[in-house]
Amino acid sequence: MRHAKRGRKLGRDAAHRNLMLGTMAGQLITHGRIKTTEAKAKELRGVVDRLINIAKRDDLHARRQAVKVLKDKRVVRHLFEEVAPDLDDRTSGYTRILKLGPRQGDGAEQVYLELVNHRVE
């Protein structure tokens, strides 16, 4: 029975899942919006919210924690210098999910996951 089991496995082992979520978090921070499946977006929401809360502290340890997840110092710099200061007035809820409908090939529910301060050009 799955009582009190948190998180989704997304059909991957732990290392693959963590690397995928870190990469997707970096893409979301860089571009402000990504298109993905609903299950991945719901799992990624928590990762990004934690990263933004870490970035709000803006100290050396916070940067090292962010690099541990994101693996790219340029993305970390963007997170700390541009994204986190814009979201400083919020305590949580940094992302939103916009449903797009099922994918043509396999019927997986597609969504946009975006930062709430993202401006669509």
From Swiss-Prot:
The family database entries (InterPro entries) matched by this protein are listed as: Ribosomal_bL17, Ribosomal_bL17_sf
Q: Which residues cross the membrane?
A: none
Concerning Gene3D superfamilies, the annotation shows: Ribosomal protein L17
One BP annotation, GO: translation
- Can you supply one Gene Ontology CC term for this chain's record? cytosolic large ribosomal subunit
The answer to keyword Ribonucleoprotein applying to this record is yes
Which keywords appear in this protein's UniProt record, sorted alphabetically? Ribonucleoprotein, Ribosomal protein
> Matching PANTHER family, A to Z?
LARGE RIBOSOMAL SUBUNIT PROTEIN BL17M, RIBOSOMAL PROTEIN L17
According to the record's subunit comment, the protein's assembly and interactions are: Part of the 50S ribosomal subunit. Contacts protein L32.
- Family that this chain belongs to: Belongs to the bacterial ribosomal protein bL17 family.
> Can you say what this protein is called?
Large ribosomal subunit protein bL17
Question: Corresponding gene?
Answer: rplQ
